[in-house]
Structures are given as structure tokens and as C-alpha cells.
């Protein structure tokens, strides 16, 4: 009898595929098509990280909250989902819908029900790496939840934030450096506590986090929003099409992030593979290819991408229509915003909409001027340091890009020491200034020592600006 029912289910599926119709199969057929992975003793784990703070970075926490709702609806247990977010957005005075976070113009609230595992200053590098390793004793604060996985388990890590060559932002100092992250992933593999691990990364220059650093053979498959040399993009921003509701003055999401999340919501994760999603997300994130867009990349064990998404994200029974899809039905935006300019978009729209003569307009004007002044200070300081160190060759040395497949820098300790030397004299690099991490890495690759950097930074920066963006109150970024 079972064989007959199974054959009938298969027959109906093939008829639907040929005719183009969508057939909702009965639960017994669903069981027939369910991958064998669901029948083993494996457990799904997830780590979701929003690595920023500030209302102008609304989109990162919106991405992560939306990802949580997707996994929860997919049946991933709450106790197995670890969430890192500063949690300063939902109840922020700038939020036009207090207590609510949306990730798309017509989206539902994605904030309600999201666990507050690690918030505020608990969102830091040490806690994140301890969570991935399952090391409860190394935690400081938070819920104490870690990835306590076993050898048959599957892990999904999603990180949304600002980035720069070789570095990922954190709302607390220091930032997360590529070598430290990859070292922890290697330790996790050596511990024998997972069967496969998938890492989705949203950040500028995110390809540099894994390029030349993540080897094959660790059963890790990673995709990134951009290659090692380009920005990633915010989306659903004011002035775009589609645009957020009129009361919002900030971007609601990030292009790569909403691409994979919205794809997951519209397709059957029991049949869609990691590779199929990669191709769809790559197409949507590429945008126009001229005015905007980035190159989604993949690293590690590419063969792992043949696995079904259900293995890592679960599946929502409402989406189990078993329709194979090779076209992304979601319309790409007409225009998007460079990740590094999203804060300026917020400040500018805040200024434009504020009543003339109001305290809000004065505040917004100050925020725009402070942000622009900080950018000029960092850009000019790095350029001048390059000239002081390398003379007329400074610009060429600072902007040199290593061949594909090579890591950003040979000596990561050197990179961190030069970052600290710069910040001691010139102030914080900030979420904007980490775009210059390649320039500092190239100083190391050219043999520059910390003493030389100190001397050059002292000449380039007689004083540290008083701007909040330059403040070192939170400590050094390395």
C-alpha cells in the first residue's frame, strides 16, 4: 500500500511539473519527498549576528530579526538559535513604529518574539567566538546559550553588518578580524562537533573574510554579499523604488540579506539547494551591474552547496508545494544605497523632513556635518600617512590589490598593531574608516613597522577631532 501511495504522489508531482500547475500534496506525500536528512539524529543550530548599533543601521537588526522568524517558522528550535543584536532599534525614539521592526516596505513586524540572547555590550567578539565554539565558561553576560552541537549536527551562521577588507564591524570594540574568525571555524571543525556548517555574510568587502583563509575540507560552505574589493548595498531606502513607508528615514534591509531571506520565504526549502539559492541571490544582488550591485561569492567546500536548504533552515509547511523554481520572482530594486552611505541617507532625510527652525533640524544638520567631516579626516589622514611612508608611490602602494586567492595580509598582528597606532593619534576609524583596512594591510605587506606608523600618524594628525565618530571611548578597533 505504501508503495502505491508513494508512486501516486510522485505521479502527481510530475504531472504538475509538466503542466506548470502548483499542486498542494497531502501530508503523506510530503513525508515521501522529505529528505532523508530529517530522519537522522541531527540537530539544527543557528547563530544570527547584527554587528552594529545606531538607528541609522536599522537594517542590520531588521535582517537578523527577519532571519530568526524564518528559522523559527521552519521548525528550528528556539533553544538552538542564538541571537546577537544591540537591541537599540525597536524602542528607539527615531522609530516611527515603537516596538516594531520591519525588513521590507510592506513587511510584518519581525521583532516580536526574537530572543534577547546577547544585547548591548554583550554583542562582542569574545562572546561570539565562545558561542560558536560552545564554550560557556568564556561568556560574559548574556543568556548563556551556545552552539552545543554534536558530530551529526548542522550549523547555520548569518552575520549582517559593516565591514572592510579583512574585518567585520562590532558595536563594541574590538572588531572581528578575518584570521580570528577563520581560526575559530577551524577549531570548531577540529572538535568534531558538527557535520556541516553554512555561513552567510553580509558586509562590504566580505569576500576578504574568507579569501585565502577558509580552506576546503572543513565541511564549511560560505557565501558573501560582495567580493574582496567592493561594497555591499542597503535596500528599501528612502527615495528608492520600492521605498519604505513615508515615515521611515532609514534603509530597512540589505540587498544580499533580503535576497536570501525573501527567496527562502517564497520557495520550498525541501527541494531548493544551497547552490540554487546562491545563483538566485547572486543574480538579484548583482543589480544593474553598472550603477549598483556586488558580486556574491562562495568559499570553502563548494560541493556542500548541493545540499537542500531544509538541512540548515528547516521548512515552513505552508511553503511545501514542491515547485522547482529557477527564476527569482522578486523584482530587483531600481536603485540601492551603498552600505557606507546609509547613515548619510538617514541624516539627510531626517534633515529634509524636519520643520524649519526645529531642534530636530538642527540636530540632523549637525549629524550630517559631523559624519562628512569625519570622512574627510580619515580619508585625508590615510592618504597623508601613505605619502609620508612611501613618497610619491604612496597612493599606488595603499591601493594595491593582491591576486585572487591570497589573504589580505601576511601578518595579522602587524595589521592590528598599525590600526591601534593610527587610532592613537588620529582617532577611531569607525564603521566608515574600516574601508581603509587594505591600505593599512599594504603597509604591513611592505614591511612598515609600528614605530614608523606612529611617527607618520603623529605628523598627519596633530590632534584627534572631537567628533563622536572619532571618539575612542569604546576602545581601539583592534
Curated annotation (Swiss-Prot):
EC number: 3.4.22.34
Tissue specificity as recorded in UniProt: Specific to vegetative organs, especially in senescent tissues. Expressed in developing seeds, rosette leaves, cauline leaves and stems. Not expressed in the siliques. Also present at the branching points of the roots and in vascular tissues.
Post-translational changes noted in the entry: Auto-catalytic activation.
Record-level Gene Ontology MF annotations: cysteine-type endopeptidase activity
EC primary class: hydrolase
Disulfide bonds: 237-251, 414-444, 426-461
GO cellular component: protein storage vacuole
Induction note: By senescence, wounding, ethylene and salicylic acid (SA).
Active-site residues (renumbered): 162, 204
Location(s), subcellular: Vacuole
One Pfam family, short name: Peptidase_C13
Site, Required for post-translational maturation and enzyme activity: residue positions: 251
Sugar attachment sites: 135, 321
Coiled-coil intervals: none
Alphabetically ordered keywords of this record: Disulfide bond, Glycoprotein, Hydrolase, Protease, Signal, Thiol protease, Vacuole
Signal sequence region: 1-20
GO biological process: proteolysis involved in protein catabolic process; vacuolar protein processing
Catalysis: reaction(s): Hydrolysis of proteins and small molecule substrates at -Asn-|-Xaa- bonds
Phenotypic consequence of gene deletion: No macroscopic phenotype, probably due to functional redundancy. In plants lacking all vacuolar-processing enzyme isozymes (e.g. alpha, beta, gamma and delta) shift of storage protein accumulation from normally processed polypeptides to a finite number of prominent alternatively processed polypeptides cleaved at sites other than the conserved Asn residues targeted by VPE.
UniProt record similarity statement: Belongs to the peptidase C13 family.
Chain's role: Asparagine-specific endopeptidase involved in the processing of vacuolar seed protein precursors into the mature forms. Probably involved in post-translational proteolysis of seed storage proteins in the protein storage vacuole of developing seeds.
Protein's name according to its UniProt entry: Vacuolar-processing enzyme alpha-isozyme
Organism of provenance: Arabidopsis thaliana
